[in-house]
Amino acid sequence: MAKNYGDVYHVEGWGEPYFAVNKDGHLCVRIYGRETLPGQEIDVLSVIEQATSADGTGKKLQFPMILRFPDVLRHRINSLHTAFANAIKYTQYGSVYQGVFPVKVNQHKDVVQDMVHFGYDHSYGLEAGSKPELLIAMSCLTKAKPGAYLVCNGYKDSAYVALALAARAMGLNVIIVLEMEEELDIVIEESSKLGVEPVIGVRAKLLTKIPGHFGSTAGKHGKFGLPAEKIYEVAKKLKALNKLHWLKLLHFHVGSMIPTTDIVFKAASEASDIYCALVKEYGVETMTTLDCGGGLGVDYDGTRSGSSDMSVAYGLEEYASSIVQAVRLKCDYHGVPHPVLCTESGRAMASYHSMIILEALSAIPEPKDDEDEATTEQLHGRIRDLSSKLQPTGLSMSSHAVHIKKHGIEMYKLGKKLSKSVTTDAHTIYNYHMNLSVFSLMPDYWGIQHLFPMMPVSRLDEKPTHKATLVDVTCDSDGKVDKFIRDTETMPLHPLDPKLGGYYVAVLLTGAYQEALSNKHNLFGGPSLVRVVGTGNGGAFNVEAALLGSTTEELIGTVSYDVKQDISSVIEERARENKVWEMVEKLVESGLHTMPYLADYKPPPMA
């Protein structure tokens, strides 16, 4: 049997249970998770080849592209509900779990509609944080099981509240969650105008928070929600208005990636105390639901350590068990009926079902400058020399501070070079030019240094011999990928060989937030989209939809140009003056109606 080099990319860690390397050395998708039978895996290279083959009109999809596997979405939803069902049964919890998918995580029509469709039997609902998202949710939830939640979060004006009340009048189970005390006045006013009685919740600002980037909006200094004493003020105000029965839900959110279950347990316990106080001390006997927000994380680096923003130290079962046990213990202690449990788990539901496919254009050895040629011992010597210059001198204090800063920066740079020298000694680093815009396809990498697992789609039965960084096609020095999971500055790739066909790198676990946050730097836009559904054994699949990414004409139109009037007509006029319109017309038409990324590029052979 051929050697499998999937372990070089740690696929057995972050990829469990959906990704593996098959006998042909290709990345494959196990669409049913651990229940995927031998032969049911979908070969990613086969999908790419089918998606890029010309159709009856001679047209074919361009790179980059996103592959969606909706079967994985279905499996994620079922797995989440199974985890909560098992925890509820094991602990003899006295209520049920009923979750929602936050539309902000991936607003694409197919994804949101799939979430509602696949979650129908579980009364799976949606969460909206703005008026556009609310309209999407209102439409999609007309196909949901009656009673599915439509949770309305985010800051609200009168129009938002009125729209939410209209959705309630349509028979949807809408809950307006107060982020600020002032929003209650808006709800009261709009309810009176429309004659629609609302159901409201309130967001708690907990003291529990998580470390790192994803915990920055939690804790007492968090952006959203009310501290416990303000929540009780809301209850008092509702009671004075004889509207206490409106209040039915308590919501909290401590961060998008909770690293460990002890924080999950602590947050659920703290929120349960507030929930129980509302019922027992403030007489809100209509309370029914505890919404535990997001935070169910994804183990992007596959370490299962929870030691960074890229990792969580638990799975679905441990997460569900922590919430159920924490809430049960507090409610039993206070003598309060167990509430319906809701979570807004978006990242963990959507991440696995989607991957970005990048096409390698060329690979060029990174040139070494004089300092890069320095030996490790020479670099050590330079650092020692700089250290000796940091001793106190007769300079003034301010001059001495400038002196220390200057040499400190030099030492830092040399230290970085020393570190790189140690890790890449005797290895040339190659810059792989990819048909990619980091800003459009991987905005979280560029914006918050979020790392995603990456690996070649094929040749995984060959040892990758090149240490590589990835550079994109934008005219921006930030358009590169030189940080990878497991804290490395290169990733192993194979030499490019045109005789073997295209060489593709998959960026995985990208189904959450990347499309929503995408931008158009250099007017490189969105990728082609391919929807892939398994059809049974033998790795059979159907490409249900294959959509070309944003064309140049569409992208130019987004920045206030009238393409016909401001672009085509102006170019035509000048081209006719120079008697070259016959040539220019074809090129302009082709340029406008294709994606701005490179097409039909043939990489040169590598030495």
UniProtKB/Swiss-Prot annotation:
UniProt key word Magnesium: yes
EC number: 4.1.1.19
GO biological process, one term: arginine catabolic process
Signal peptide extent: none
Amino acids binding substrate: L290, D291, C292, G293, G294, G295, L296, G297, V298, D299, Y300
Catalytic activity: L-arginine + H(+) = agmatine + CO2
PROSITE patterns: ODR_DC_2_1, ODR_DC_2_2
Gene Ontology molecular function, alphabetical: arginine decarboxylase activity
InterPro entries reported for this sequence: Ala_racemase/Decarboxylase_C, Arg_decrbxlase, De-COase2_CS, De-COase2_N, De-COase2_pyr-phos_BS, Orn/DAP/Arg_de-COase, PLP-binding_barrel
Class of enzymatic activity (EC top level): lyase
Record-listed N6-(pyridoxal phosphate)lysine modification sites: K104
Superkingdom of the organism of origin: Eukaryota
Keywords: Decarboxylase, Lyase, Magnesium, Putrescine biosynthesis, Pyridoxal phosphate, Spermidine biosynthesis
Cofactor: pyridoxal 5'-phosphate; Mg(2+)
Keyword Nucleus: no
Pathway membership, UniProt: Amine and polyamine biosynthesis; agmatine biosynthesis; agmatine from L-arginine: step 1/1
Similarity remark: Belongs to the Orn/Lys/Arg decarboxylase class-II family. SpeA subfamily.
Name under which the protein is recorded: Arginine decarboxylase
